[in-house]
Regions:
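PLP-dependent amino-acid enzyme catalytic core
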Residues: 1-494
């Protein structure tokens, strides 16, 4: 299976080349030239598999230049009991809906599913391509991706990783997870501005041909651990198939019937992975795209106009504080009939004017698949409180946004299709916001709050979050976006 580019249909490269590159030189994103088909019989066979086996099966359909034995070894290591516990992606019934818990990995966020596996895929891809260069991983993060990438790539031979996060734009626990990171090959800095500034800076570096050529001359290749990299996205497709199997096994859905999937959405990668699962054969009726107050996606799905020219809000769900949703480009490409010229036009308009309006036909195609809505901090807090009091389920602010938007969708449409809601982070990463939502005391340091939340909820504190209290901060700097390239050159290139 080869991969093409959202901005150039003449591109045709292998999976390993796409993973190594991360992003096309023209700024476009890679997608399979065609999607593999997964029949109901195939899904039925997955019902008795372990999570690593399910993941290896689905990922193997996309990464055809990897052997089945290779992928089984990688998923067994990446999703081991020591990293994810007994059940990496459990589905929990909260009374009417199913919650897909994606926060049981080493950094307590859904990004672990991709970023524990990506180092294996990336280093193997380099070997398959006969490349011995050092691979420099660049990451822009709104909170969770940075730590998950650092955890995955720390001290991996032949790699270095540099993470940029928005100053003041993460939770305190998210910040500490990054600034205390151990490893000889890791580098972290805050960037003045918001996530979009950091992400735009990283994209600009990738498409700076003079700079990337200079690095290649020094034996260094840039790659990405953001979801613009196909190697980040494909592991996420697997957990939606796994969720369906677990729902069927638990009787939450009759096998073969459709489900709805609700996802808290910022950069559009997680919900796009769910849509790709449907394209492959997963029985899905509707996708519910849930935004916070930065509701650019809600407005787009409703109107057909994407406009980032709006106020940027810092919310209690910081991983969704995004106004430029990079993975939306992949959806535009797919639903426009793989019209690369049309996508180039939209992306050029976004770069020039900060907005674009899709064709009526494309807008209808998007609206047919995706419902949408948003919940501000007050609604998210009320949902946290009510969900805990009525269902005894403790949700983090991102998950609460998805629950609130899904409940609104169900009420307004009467659609009672069995649903799964993606829970993307542990509530302990956002203890202050969760405690405030519950009407509890929020005085004291972050670790006092974590302890208090554990006492109230009866839940165990993730061990790696608890361990942060004894770790010293290594990375305390903050730079201007214009200084990102210089920071990389001074720090990673030695």
């Amino acid at each position: 299976m080869n991969y093409t580019c959202t901005r150039d249909n003449s591109t045709s490269i292998s999976a390993s080349k796409a993973i190594l590159a991360g992003i096309s030189p023209d700024g476009g994103l890679f997608l399979p030239e065609e999607f593999p088909k997964v029949s109901l019989d195939d899904i039925a066979k997955m019902r008795s598999m372990t999570y690593p086996e399910r993941a290896a099966y689905i990922i193997g359909l996309f990464l055809t230049d990897f052997t089945n034995d290779e992928l089984k070894a990688y998923t067994a290591a990446a999703y081991s009991k020591s990293r994810f516990g007994e059940i990496p992606a459990p589905v929990v019934d909260i009374g009417g809906e199913s919650i897909l818990e994606l926060f049981h990995g080493p950094t307590s966020a859904f990004k672990d599913f991709a970023l524990q596996l990506l180092p294996y895929l990336l280093t193997a891809s380099a070997k398959k391509q006969g490349i011995n260069d050092k691979i420099a991983i660049l990451v822009a993060t709104s909170g969770d991706t940075g730590k998950a990438a650092l955890e995955g790539f720390a001290d991996v031979d032949g790699t270095g990783i540099c993470v940029f996060y928005p100053y003041g734009g993460t939770s305190e626990i998210q910040r500490l997870q990054m600034t205390t990171q151990q490893g000889k090959n890791v580098l972290v800095t805050a960037v003045k501005g918001n996530f979009d500034d950091a992400q735009s800076g990283v994209k600009a570096i990738f498409t700076d041909k003079a700079y990337t050529d200079e690095l290649k001359g020094m034996g260094i290749r840039l790659s990405s651990a953001n979801s613009i990299n196909w190697g980040r996205l494909v592991p996420q497709v697997a957990y939606y198939f796994s969720a369906y199997c677990d729902m069927a096994n638990a009787g939450a859905v009759k096998f073969g019937d459709e489900i709805n999937i609700a996802v808290p959405t910022g950069n559009f990668g997680n919900i796009l992975a769910a849509y790709i699962a449907k394209l492959c054969g997963l029985p899905v009726k509707r996708f519910i795209c849930a935004s916070n107050k930065n509701n650019v996606l809600t407005d787009f799905i409703q109107s057909g106009t994407y406009d980032k020219n709006r106020p940027f809000y810092l919310t209690t769900s910081p991983s969704m504080d995004i106004l430029i949703s990079s993975n939306l480009e992949r959806l535009l490409y797919l639903l426009s009939g793989r019209n690369d010229a049309e996508v180039r036009g939209y992306m050029a308009a976004l770069a020039k004017d900060g907005k674009y309006t899709v064709s009526p036909g494309l807008h209808r195609a998007i609206a047919a698949e995706f419902a949408c809505g948003f919940a501000d901090d007050a609604r998210a807090a009320e949902t946290i409180r009510r969900t805990f009091e009525e269902r005894r389920y403790l949700a983090d602010p991102h998950t609460a946004v998805a629950i609130a938007v899904y409940e609104e969708y169900k009420l307004s449409t009467g659609d009672c299709t069995p649903a799964v809601i993606a829970s993307t982070a542990s509530p302990f990463k956002f203890s202050r916001s969760v405690l405030k939502a519950l009407g509890k005391d929020t005085s004291g340091c972050e670790f006092d709050l974590i302890d208090r939340l554990a006492d109230i909820s009866g839940l165990a504190i993730p061990s790696r979050l608890a361990g942060l209290r004894d770790m010293a901060e290594r990375f305390t700097g903050c730079i201007e976006p214009a200084g990102m390239k210089s920071f990389i050159s001074k720090g990673l290139i030695k």
